[in-house]
């Protein structure tokens, strides 16, 4: 309590002095400004406490002094302010003082009022501070304070200032940021002077746990590392260190809202009330007294008194040597500080590894403090984790089994085929379905082994090292081509001896056209042929395709013989096809010229066209091109359904009925008989398509293609002649040349006959074209076009005949009148018979209407 009263008294006096100083400055503002230069005093090892810059507002907390940074003087203010202050303090002009004598009572009243207000505000602030500190003190900290001896209560409070003064003196020339903080705080740029200069100097905060675990862990840590027994074994500054530790407990457990106000007052106490020589701790060398690591902080900022500690090296060694006490189920106490902060302490006996708690963020100003480099460093091994999940157990077991297998000299696991999936990370804090799954890895390796890796062990087998790889070293043909040849040979089911005998004798019937075509496809290139001929090794080293081609190439001009034999095998079929095609063309010309029904249809179209073109330039025509037949279906009647082709078909049907009808005069024909005759006439018209079947087949031919086939046969004869010229160069296979010589004579005769048939067919086609088109035959680009036109017309005629057969004598009356007027050879009936016939016909037509 005495330090608190001293603090309040000092603050009151400072406020009065500040108000008085402000009044003096205000009275000398009219004085001229003199450029007074200010020289900063040299920095000393023992820092002097700077005068705090208090505000007259009691609600604003005082600016704390950083004990962790260097204790340097603040930078000088501008020259104008320094001149005013220095002039006012050194003694203003007597005229100014004399002139202000009249305002002394007013100034005294103002000073007294301000002092009274400041005292009241400070008393209220002190009461609130004490009340808040008592309520916010953690129960565990209060219990630790209660267990202290009675003598330590005052010793700790009295040695706080000494400890902080020592720490401030040790870190005077460390931080360059100490120079600008008072100026920034004076200008109001920042309220907290403890701002960390760079975020890279501050490590990441640990993972947060529950509030209860943190609170319990904090109390355990305080009880383990800040005990009176440990302080008694230290140096003379142990009391100060204990006081600092007690203050850290209160600051760490206090709420966040009161951190700024509580952070500033203890630093002021240590700065403005220096300790006596008896209470001041003995300064220890930097190499013997490194600061211990603070407990895990509750926030990102560390309170001022928890940044440094005044403990000695012996105290730290004692803490590291003594194992931590076994706590209740709460988390274990924190480990000793890291080795980078203790690299100057002597090496103690190795302590048992304590459990590692979550590491809090290290203060940035501690990182800025230079650490000596000499002395061995202590490396504290970390204890293994206490809790192991199920999946970690399974993974560890699997890895251990694989490690033992590899250590025992087993073969490496083969590479399997990949499975592309979306990998999900399993959680270690909950039970999942994947923890219960088991796989048969041996079966997976058997089923899904990669072929490239599966072949490698077999190739490296020492039993097969001595055997040469014939398929890779002795292969001549392309692998794909050799495989195709082997497949063809198995499909044809023929032996090598049969092929060689047929080639030597020239017997094409023995092999057949299919096998000869396959041999032509097997023909190697010139490079492959040279390799096969020059091969002198063991034939068993070659594949089946290479052995077959090697045996065939041993025959002179083997593949030329194959071409000639294939020509001979196909010659007869090709000649027969050409002869049949030419005969079809001649038959089509004869059928088209001699068809009576086709000529009658042309007559009906000509008469109808002349009747429709009366009075025009197209009228009175004597002939028309057959292409007009394709336009009959485009001319439609008034009803929109009946076309000109329908009408022509009906007229041809009735004309056929009239020829088959042989009734006497004045005889009324039976309606059923007329219908029957009508159907017969329709069959006759529809039979035109069958009658001109050769025309349809001729329309599918191309005369240029037929001429190309004939030319190909003649070229084949030239190949036979060239092979026969090689007879003198061959010592074997004489029967082949004799057989080919006989075939050549027969083939020449056949080709001459085919040439004659071709000319005859072409002449007949030109003749039939002139028969229908006259001199327009010269305009035809395609010689067989006339057959294609007739074929298309016949398909249209069949379609119309099917439609007419479905109708029920729709145009009987109009067709009969047209028939009577057109056929003059029919007998003229008397009026009565004609009327009776008309009545009967009308009666027969009425039901159908």
UniProtKB/Swiss-Prot annotation:
Entry keyword annotation includes Ribosomal protein: no
Gene Ontology process terms (BP): actin cytoskeleton organization; actin nucleation
Superkingdom of this protein's organism: Eukaryota
InterPro entries registered for this protein in UniProt: FH2_Formin, FH2_Formin_sf, Formin-like_plant
MF annotations from Gene Ontology: actin filament binding
Chain ranges passing through the membrane: 109-129
Biased composition (Low complexity): 53-64, 247-279
GO CC terms of this entry: cytoskeleton; membrane
Biased composition (Basic and acidic residues): 185-194
Annotated ranges, domain FH2: 406-823
Region ranges (Disordered): 36-104, 185-364
Signal peptide positions (record): 1-22
Membrane topology: Single-pass membrane protein
Gene3D superfamilies to which the protein is assigned, alphabetical: Formin, FH2 domain
Subcellular location: Membrane
Family that this chain belongs to: Belongs to the formin-like family. Class-I subfamily.
Protein name (database record): Formin-like protein 4
Gene: FH4
């Amino acid at each position: 309590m005495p330090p608190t009263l001293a603090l309040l008294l000092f603050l009151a006096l400072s406020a009065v002095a500040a108000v008085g100083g402000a009044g003096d400055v205000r009275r000398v503002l009219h004085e001229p400004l003199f450029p007074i230069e200010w020289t900063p005093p040299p920095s000393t090892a023992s820092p002097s406490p700077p005068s705090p810059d208090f505000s007259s507002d009691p609600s604003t907390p005082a600016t704390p002094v950083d004990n962790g940074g260097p204790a340097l003087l603040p930078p000088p203010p501008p020259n104008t302010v320094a001149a005013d202050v220095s002039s006012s303090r050194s003694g203003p002009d007597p005229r100014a003082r004399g002139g202000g004598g009249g305002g002394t009572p007013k100034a005294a009243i103002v000073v007294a009022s301000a002092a009274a207000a400041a005292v009241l505000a400070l008393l209220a602030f002190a009461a609130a501070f004490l009340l808040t500190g008592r309520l916010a003190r953690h129960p565990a900290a209060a219990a630790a304070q209660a267990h202290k001896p009675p003598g330590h209560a005052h010793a700790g409070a009295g040695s706080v200032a000494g400890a902080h003064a020592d720490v401030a003196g040790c870190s005077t020339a460390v931080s360059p940021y100490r120079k600008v903080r008072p100026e920034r705080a004076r200008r109001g740029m920042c309220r907290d002077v403890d701002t960390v200069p760079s975020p890279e100097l501050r490590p990441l905060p640990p993972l947060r746990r529950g509030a209860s675990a943190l609170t319990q862990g904090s109390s355990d840590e305080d009880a383990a590392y800040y005990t009176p027994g440990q302080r008694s074994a230290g140096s003379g500054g142990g009391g100060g260190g204990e006081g600092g530790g007690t203050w850290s407990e209160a600051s760490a457990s206090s709420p966040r809202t009161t951190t700024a106000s509580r952070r500033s007052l203890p630093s002021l106490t240590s700065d403005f009330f220096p300790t006596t020589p008896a209470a001041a701790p003995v300064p220890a060398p930097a190499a013997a007294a490194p600061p211990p690591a603070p407990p895990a902080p509750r926030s990102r900022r560390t309170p001022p008194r928890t940044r440094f500690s005044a403990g000695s090296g012996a105290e730290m060694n004692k803490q590291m040597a003594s194992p931590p006490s076994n706590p209740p189920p709460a988390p274990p106490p924190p480990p000793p500080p890291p080795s980078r902060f203790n690299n100057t302490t002597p090496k103690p006996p190795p302590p048992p590894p304590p459990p590692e708690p979550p590491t809090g963020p290290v203060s940035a100003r501690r990182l800025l403090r230079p650490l000596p480099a000499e002395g061995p460093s202590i490396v504290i091994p970390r204890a293994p984790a206490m809790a192991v999940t199920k999946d970690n157990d399974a993974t560890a077991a699997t890895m251990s089994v694989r490690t033992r297998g590899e250590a025992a000299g087993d073969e490496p696991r083969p590479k399997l085929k990949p499975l592309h999936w979306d990998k999900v990370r399993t959680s270690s804090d909950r039970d999942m379905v994947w923890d219960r799954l088991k796989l048969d890895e041996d079966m997976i390796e058997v089923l899904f082994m990669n072929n490239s890796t599966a072949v490698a062990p077999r190739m490296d087998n020492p039993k097969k090292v001595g055997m040469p790889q014939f398929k890779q070293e002795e292969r001549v043909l392309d692998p794909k081509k050799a495989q195709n040849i082997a497949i063809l040979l198995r499909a044809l089911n023929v032996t090598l001896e049969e092929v060689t005998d047929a080639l030597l004798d020239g017997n094409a019937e023995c092999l057949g056209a299919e096998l000869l075509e396959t041999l032509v496809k097997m023909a190697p290139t010139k490079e492959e042929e040279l390799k096969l001929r020059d091969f002198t090794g063991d034939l068993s080293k070659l594949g089946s395709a290479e052995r077959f081609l090697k045996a065939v190439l041993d025959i002179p001009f083997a593949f030329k013989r194959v071409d000639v034999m294939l020509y001979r095998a196909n010659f007869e079929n090709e000649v027969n096809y050409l002869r049949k095609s030419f005969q079809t063309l001649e038959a089509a010309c004869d059928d088209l010229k001699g068809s009576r029904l086709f000529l009658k249809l042309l007559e009906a179209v000509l008469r109808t066209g002349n009747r429709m073109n009366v009075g025009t330039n197209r009228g009175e025509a004597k002939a028309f091109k057959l292409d007009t037949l394709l336009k009959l279906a485009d001319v439609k009647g008034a009803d929109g359904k009946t076309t000109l082709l329908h009408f022509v078909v009906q007229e041809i049907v009735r004309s056929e009925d009239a020829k088959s009808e042989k009734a006497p005069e004045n005889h009324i024909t039976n309606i059923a008989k007329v219908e029957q005759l009508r159907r017969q006439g329709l069959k006759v018209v529809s039979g035109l398509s069958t009658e001109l079947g050769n025309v349809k087949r001729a329309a599918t031919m191309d005369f240029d293609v037929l001429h190309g086939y004939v030319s190909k046969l003649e070229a084949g004869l030239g190949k036979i002649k060239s092979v026969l010229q090689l007879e003198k160069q061959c010592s074997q296979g004489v029967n082949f040349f004799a057989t080919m010589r006989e075939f050549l004579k027969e083939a020449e005769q056949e080709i001459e006959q085919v040439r004659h048939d071709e000319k005859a067919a072409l002449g007949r086609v030109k003749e039939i074209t002139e028969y229908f088109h006259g001199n327009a035959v010269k305009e035809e680009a395609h010689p067989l076009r006339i057959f294609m036109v007739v074929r298309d017309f016949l398909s249209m005629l069949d379609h119309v005949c099917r439609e007419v057969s479905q109708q029920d004598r729709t145009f009987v009356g109009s067709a009969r009148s047209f028939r009577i007027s057109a056929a003059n050879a029919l007998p003229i009936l008397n009026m009565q018979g004609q009327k009776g016939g008309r009545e009967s016909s009308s009666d027969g037509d009425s039901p159908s209407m």
